[in-house]
C-alpha cells in the first residue's frame, strides 16, 4: 500500500493548534489545490469529543468559507480527521498558512457567537447522518480552547520522519 503524505510526519512533535500544508498539487488544467492539516489537538494526548467535533464540522465549514474564500481561494471541503485531533481542508488556491490561521481564529469567534443548537446548519434527519449526535457546548469549548492557545504553524521540514525511521516502522 502506498504511504500517504500524512503518515510521513512525526506526530510526536506536532504542535496544536496549528496549520500545516499537508499537500499541494495541480489539476490537469493547472489549478493549484492545497490540502491543509488544521490540527486542533496534540496527537496522542488530546482528542475532540465526538459530539463537539460533529457540531464543529457543521459550523466550521461555513464560517471558514466566510473568512477565507476570495482572492484566488475557494474551499472545496473541510472534513474531520478520523483520529479526532483536527480537520483536513482542501481548497483551490495557495493561501499562506498565516492567512489560514487568521481565518480559522475568526471562524472560532463565530462559533462562540452561536446562541442556540437550532442555529446549527443542516441539523435535521434529512441532511445529517447522525443528527442527534451534536453538542453546541462542546463545539464552543473547542473553539474557546483554540482562541486561548492561539494558532501556530507546523512545518513539514521540521516534522518529517527520517527515512531510517520509516524503514524501522516497516513502511
UniProtKB/Swiss-Prot annotation:
EC number of the protein: 4.4.1.21
GO biological process: L-methionine salvage from S-adenosylmethionine; quorum sensing
Molecular function terms, GO-annotated: iron ion binding; S-ribosylhomocysteine lyase activity
Lineage, broadest ranks: Bacteria, Pseudomonadati, Pseudomonadota, Gammaproteobacteria, Enterobacterales
UniProt source species: Escherichia coli (strain K12)
Root EC class: lyase
Chain's role: Involved in the synthesis of autoinducer 2 (AI-2) which is secreted by bacteria and is used to communicate both the cell density and the metabolic potential of the environment. The regulation of gene expression in response to changes in cell density is called quorum sensing. Catalyzes the transformation of S-ribosylhomocysteine (RHC) to homocysteine (HC) and 4,5-dihydroxy-2,3-pentadione (DPD).
Keywords per UniProt: Autoinducer synthesis, Iron, Lyase, Metal-binding, Quorum sensing
Subunit-structure text: Homodimer.
Family: Belongs to the LuxS family.
One Pfam family of this chain: LuxS
Annotated GO CC locations: cytosol
Record's signal peptide: none
Positions of Fe cation binding: 54, 58, 128
Reaction(s) catalysed (UniProt annotation): S-(5-deoxy-D-ribos-5-yl)-L-homocysteine = (S)-4,5-dihydroxypentane-2,3-dione + L-homocysteine
Protein name, as recorded: S-ribosylhomocysteine lyase
Gene of this entry: luxS
Coiled-coil regions listed in the entry: none
